[in-house]
Structures are given as structure tokens and as C-alpha cells.
Amino acid sequence: MKVIFVIQGEGRGHLTQALALKQMLLHEGHEVVKVLVGKSKNRVIPEFFQNKIGTPIEVFDSPNFLPSKDNRKFNLLRSLAYNTLLVPSYLSSIHLIRKNIQECGADIIINFYEVLCGITCSLFRFGIPEVCIGHQYLFLHPSFQMPGKYPVPESLLKFFTRITCMGATAKLALSIRDYEDEPVHGIKVV
């Protein structure tokens, strides 16, 4: 089976998950044919990832949340203004994602919490499964409760998370705690 990874590259967790999954897929005889990484203008894809992924990487601009002055939470107004100015760049990114999915011959799309991948898959319906992976999909689980002092409003997190998985065939919610799968919501807890 041929696989394309689309990864939200702002943190290091999704990149590390992609490295681990790639090794598992290779062990089972599958091939990761392309890796797309979304990032903001200020981020650099870490060298450890570039050295270890062993598959062609293409980087694209992707929305992100800007921190507050004290760097303890994100600044909603600043983030909205900043990302609104970059909409033309994000439209180019959607085109890049679409083109790569269409041309790489993948049998499946693995989306590591990349919002523009969710939008692209919802708009264009490629006829192949999109599987979304990340601990954030646990936010959509009816039994999950947000910690008391979380820096981002729960409704905003859930809204953003839903956009990342629009058009998804499955959502794999990574968790260290036991939760039942939620077939109604398409969530499998792993």
C-alpha cells in the first residue's frame, strides 16, 4: 500500500508520530511515497525529522495560533488577523496538497492534525481514505473532559479539531487513558 503523510509541523509531536508510524508501515511492507509538512513562516522543519523520514518532503504554509505577550496562551485576535492576511498563501497550500495527493499514487492519506489537509480532503474528495491521527481527536470524544485551566477555550479547540478531520474516514485519538471507541463519531482510541 502507498501512503502520503500530511503533517502539522508546528510542534514536534506530530513529526515524531509520523516517524514512528513510517517505521511500522515499512515493517509491514507498505511505502510512504510523499511527506507534506505544514508550518508557519517562523518555523523550520527540525533536522532530526529531515534526516530520519527518508521520503521526499514538501513544506507548505499553514495557519497557526500566535502566543500572547506572556507566552502562556494564544492571542485569538492577533491569530485571526495574522492568518486572514495569509489566506492567499493558504489557498496555494491547498492547491499544493491537492496536486500531491492526486499525483503521488497513494492508496491512503494519513493526516497528522493538519487543518489544510482536512479542508482539502473535504473540498476535493479524492476517493481514497483519509485517516487522522493525534491526541487532539480525544477532544471530540463525549467522555473526555478538558483540564480545569486549559489555555484555549474548549469550543474553539473542538471547532479547529473538527476542521482538521473534515472528510476523514477514521479518527485515531491517541490516549494514555482508557476510553471506549466512539463509532458514532468515527473515533477509535489508540
Regions found by a protein language model. Give the residues of each.
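Gly/Ala-rich phosphate-binding loop of Rossmann-like dinucleotide-binding domains
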Residues: 22, 26, 122
